[in-house]
Amino acid sequence: MDQKSDNAGKCPVAHTVPKGRSNRDWWPDQLDVQVLHQHSGLSDPMGKAFNYAEEFKKLDLEELKKDLHALMTESQDWWPADFGHYGGLFIRMAWHSAGTYRITDGRGGAGQGQQRFAPLNSWPDNANLDKARRLLWPIKQKYGNRISWADLMILTGNVALESMGFQTFGFAGGRADVWEPQELFWGPEGTWLGDERYSGERQLDEPLAAVQMGLIYVNPEGPNGNPDPVAAAREIRETFARMAMNDEETVALIAGGHTFGKTHGAGDPSFIGPDPEGGAIEDQGLGWKSTFGTGVGKDAITGGPEVTWSQTPTRWSNYFFENLFNYEWELTKSPAGAHQWKAKNADASIPDAFDASKKHVPTMLTTDLSLRFDPIYEKISRRFLENPDQFADAFARAWFKLTHRDMGPKVRYLGPEVPAEDLIWQDVIPAVDHKLVDENDVADLKGKVLASGLSVQELVSTAWASASTFRGSDKRGGANGARIRLAPQKDWEVNQPAQLARVLSVLEGIQKDFNTAHTGGKKISLADLIVLAGAAGVEKAAKAGGHDITVPFTPGRADASEAQTDAASFAALEPRADGFRNYVSRRRRQFMKPEEALVDRAQLLTLTAPELTVLVGGLRVVFTSRPEVLTNDFFVNLLDMGTQWSPMAEKEGVYEGRDRKTHEVKWTGTRVDLIFGSHSQLRALAEVYASSDAKEKFVGDFVAAWTKVMNADRFDLV
């Protein structure tokens, strides 16, 4: 037969597959452990051998910057450049890439190039930044793996500033891309621009650092669109502080960024199509297609306001402050219907972005006027008005901080434009200036530590307290620097200050004796000794359980000074809860259940679910009659079906386990303990370590996970 059926040549596989409900849909309150397995090698196309730092070193940065300079004025018909220069657009792209950073948990920021992915690529505040990245694609394509998207977006912001006459403070590469969206709590709202993140009298929930869902910081029209500059100033101060910026840095950033470019509110926002993630397949990831006029150039709609701040929007100047203070301002609305302000009785002195024959009167956003009508901001703004050189220096430094805040210590910085000056927000650690200890010294020091009278619990808890401050999000914290001996960490409740002071005193004595006794420049830092003492404690506990092991130790840490430590900044690292130590603060408001806080801290420590599980089991001194022995007793006794658990009426969050037959109390535990028997995935892992043949595996896995935490901030070892 040669008769063709109607289905000839068609794929035999049905493509309309019903979409089922996920486990999260069925059980929305279920503890999410999958966040511990983000950005695995399974999603990375580069392979294990790829080393971005080595690739970046091959980059001809000067050639790349020349290409970026040329791009600034190569206007494209599909997205024309305002004033013939893309500088303002690229500054906004870089700002919004970095500006998601929040100091409370160190998440967000420019470090992974997350602006490429949902939800950030579709936030209302990031409207039309997809065009900025598409303009960059030919350059990214040319330089390939030698420059990540994360680095390229920040570098392009720098080049934009430089191409418009501004002297930047510097640039460091080293931001490696990831290849999937980051699962991150951006707020509880289910709609864009929702603001269900407040409690009490407009108290913003932690760790959030923006006032509404889908905004970087604040609503430029004012709180919830209310055009009140003074009220807006309060929200600016709160959100910028949560991004680690003080008042001077805040003023400099707002004024500096608004020295260039314009906003786009040419028409009613109803003309705008879906965002990139909601667009049609033929749109190829471009969103916000507008049917207003041409949809681009003079007809572009990005947000609501239609504002140009400066008489020279493609050149660095002091016009922002001159206009801010030289005029009185009256409320008006943009063509899009958004609140904005125009100068009273002012001549038309602001150029049009696309018609050289047109001029406009100066305009400002509500949040711009905050810099004049808030008394603290006004004082700073007037100083910058009268001292343009101070303004330029403050903006250069604040911009560098904004774009590098989440990169961690300077040892991670790459490239020829890294500033020589050390800045306190970089959590400076001095270079090691002495000969390091060798294997014989390590053995000798372990012996002295174990003979000092300090218990296994004291040694292990002190090392954990020192190292577990590390945050993989912004690469802060960790054992290097020994900042556990400095304020504020030495006084944190979770660190048991009285015990900590005693342990540190003993270790400092051992350190002093060793350093005094050795000639030839050999020394051990307290940072190294704290970790070494913890290793000695783990080894002793393992030996007591019948396992003769050696915990890996690599010296090379240094001790930071008080002068190198911003105590206020480090206060953000204090845990509200630490499930590894069964700690929940009673004096600070909790935003998560204890078990959620445990997973959150594990994710900050870059731990996997198995690593989380084995560490909790090893660090516990509950569910065992051998508290200073490294055993799997925690898992064995937790999973014992001879025990029945019930909440204690007099202690919230505490449970008692009774013998099912005698009803006698055998154990007490917390939600963090019991989650390893309740949560199906964690229970599966607990069963591995509770098995009769798992004792050796448990010890080996614990030591590996312990060492990972101790070395989490050792970027010099990578």
Curated annotation (Swiss-Prot):
Enzyme class: oxidoreductase
UniProt KW keywords: Heme, Hydrogen peroxide, Iron, Metal-binding, Oxidoreductase, Peroxidase, Plasmid
Record: active site: H96
PROSITE patterns recorded: PEROXIDASE_1, PEROXIDASE_2, PEROXIDASE_4
Cross-link (Tryptophyl-tyrosyl-methioninium (Trp-Tyr) (with M-243)): W95-Y217
Cofactors named for this entry: heme b
Modification note: Formation of the three residue Trp-Tyr-Met cross-link is important for the catalase, but not the peroxidase activity of the enzyme.
Record's cofactor remark: Binds 1 heme b (iron(II)-protoporphyrin IX) group per dimer.
Pfam families for this protein: peroxidase
GO cellular component terms given for this protein: cytosol
GO biological process, one term: cellular response to hydrogen peroxide
Binding site for heme b: H258
Known catalytic reactions: H2O2 + AH2 = A + 2 H2O; 2 H2O2 = O2 + 2 H2O
MF-aspect GO terms: catalase activity; heme binding; metal ion binding
Enzyme nomenclature, EC number: 1.11.1.21
Region Disordered, annotated ranges: 1-24
HAMAP family: Catal_peroxid
Subunit record text: Homodimer or homotetramer.
Protein name (record): Catalase-peroxidase
Species this chain originates from: Sinorhizobium fredii (strain NBRC 101917 / NGR234)
Native organism taxonomy: Bacteria, Pseudomonadati, Pseudomonadota, Alphaproteobacteria, Hyphomicrobiales
